[in-house]
């Protein structure tokens, strides 16, 4: 994949606009999880260090487009950045489309792009206004690379130079390493509640990976091929498709499960064979035999791609399966890449962040890349690199 990289450019004295992913959770004006800002900081700091006049922007939440709404302001992010970079070095610009005051080595945060009408539609006029603000546009938001919007795609078409930031470059390299030429055996773990939302991902992965492990509600649909799954979350419409995948690609199906009679944090759990699940019970996690068998498959892997927990790990009584699988991934010598919100929460809970080779910041973009889809922002960068 040939794109211009920010690290290859001289940024000194240049007006640099970085599109980052600073879409973080905010409560009472404070950032409650700073993972995305931390991931973006090295890019911002590298540009400042070179003496660039730096602007950074992002979306946050889902405001009504074209209207300012304090609830979705990037101000909490600005306050966080002031703590990291010094209050005198960071400011917030609310109205910036007609130009903004910049200084070398200083950072101006441009307010939430979704306050601008035309952002989501990739409006050309808006894209040109963004482009006019900068000499170099840096796309560094992998999490929104699958959306063709004015601040992720359109701006790059019209900016004098458009390049990939270090975070985006690292994401693309890590995913490329896992999917384009994986060291074998490659094992993929796909969890989550619905087969329907991950069907394209499963279809892609069975052709790339040597083994695909399914967990969560997805696994229940596979269990339902030959068993009663009681009140479990599963998709009857996808049982035939699941059977086809199982038969054709040898997807391992759980042999035992942790079940409960109600979906609640305090519900007691019982381990039983999948063939013994009663009508009033629901499967909420792998049983021990299944979890250990899956861990065994992961032990010898050379590449692991993990998307989604294998059980309701938020409930202490239904956590063990995800914990066993997570620790097997952490203890493996494989190149491991993990992505998706719930996956990151599980990594956090079990404290294994340092043991995963690469943690992707993208949710939808991660899945679309795995499905083999073209990400509009990446396609734009490739196009610009040819010019």
Curated annotation (Swiss-Prot):
Keywords: ATP-binding, Cytoplasm, Glycolysis, Kinase, Nucleotide-binding, Transferase. SUPFAM superfamilies: Phosphoglycerate kinase. It is an enzyme of class 2 (transferase). One of its GO terms (biological process) is gluconeogenesis. One of its GO terms (molecular function) is ADP binding. Pathway: Carbohydrate degradation; glycolysis; pyruvate from D-glyceraldehyde 3-phosphate: step 2/5. ATP binds at residues 198, 314, 340-343. Substrate binds at residues 21-23, 36, 59-62, 114, 147. It catalyses: (2R)-3-phosphoglycerate + ATP = (2R)-3-phospho-glyceroyl phosphate + ADP. GO terms for cellular component: cytosol. The keyword Kinase applies. Its EC number is 2.7.2.3. Belongs to the phosphoglycerate kinase family. Monomer. This is Phosphoglycerate kinase. It comes from Erwinia tasmaniensis (strain DSM 17950 / CFBP 7177 / CIP 109463 / NCPPB 4357 / Et1/99). The gene is pgk.
């Amino acid at each position: 994949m040939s794109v211009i990289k920010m690290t290859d450019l001289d940024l000194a004295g240049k007006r640099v606009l970085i599109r980052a992913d600073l879409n973080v959770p905010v409560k009472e004006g404070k950032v409650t999880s700073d993972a995305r800002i931390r991931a973006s900081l090295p890019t911002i700091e590298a540009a400042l260090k070179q003496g660039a006049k730096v602007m950074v922007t992002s979306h946050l939440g889902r405001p009504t487009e074209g209207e300012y709404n304090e609830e979705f302001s990037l101000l909490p992010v600005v306050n966080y950045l002031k703590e990291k970079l010094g209050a005198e070095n960071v400011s917030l610009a609310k109205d910036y489309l007609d130009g903004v005051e910049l200084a070398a080595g200083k950072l101006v945060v441009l307010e939430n792009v979704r306050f601008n009408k035309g952002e989501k539609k990739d409006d050309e006029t808006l894209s040109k206004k963004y482009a006019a603000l900068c000499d170099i546009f840096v796309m560094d938001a992998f999490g929104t690379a699958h959306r063709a919007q004015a601040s992720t795609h359109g701006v790059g078409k019209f900016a004098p130079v458009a390049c990939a930031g270090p975070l985006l470059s690292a994401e693309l390299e890590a995913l490329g390493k896992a999917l384009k030429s994986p060291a074998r055996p490659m094992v993929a773990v796909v969890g989550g509640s619905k087969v329907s939302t991950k069907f394209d991902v499963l279809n892609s992965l069975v052709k790339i990976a040597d083994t695909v492990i399914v967990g969560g509600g997805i696994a229940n649909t596979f269990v339902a091929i030959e068993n009663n799954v009681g009140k479990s979350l599963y998709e009857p419409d996808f049982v035939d498709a699941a059977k086809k995948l199982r038969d054709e690609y040898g997807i391992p199906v759980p042999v035992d499960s942790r079940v409960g009679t109600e979906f609640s944090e305090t519900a007691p759990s019982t381990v039983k064979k999948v063939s013994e699940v009663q009508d009033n019970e629901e499967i909420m996690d792998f049983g021990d035999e299944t979890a250990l068998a899956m861990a065994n498959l992961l032990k010898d892997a050379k590449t692991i791609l993990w998307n989604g927990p294998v059980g309701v790990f938020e409930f202490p009584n239904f956590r063990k399966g995800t914990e066993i699988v997570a620790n097997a991934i952490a203890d493996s010598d494989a190149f491991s890449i993990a992505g998706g919100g719930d996956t990151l929460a599980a990594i956090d809970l079990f404290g294994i962040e340092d043991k995963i080779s690469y943690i992707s910041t993208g949710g939808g973009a991660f899945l679309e890349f795995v499905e083999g889809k073209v990400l509009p922002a990446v396609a734009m960068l490739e196009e610009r690199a040819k010019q």
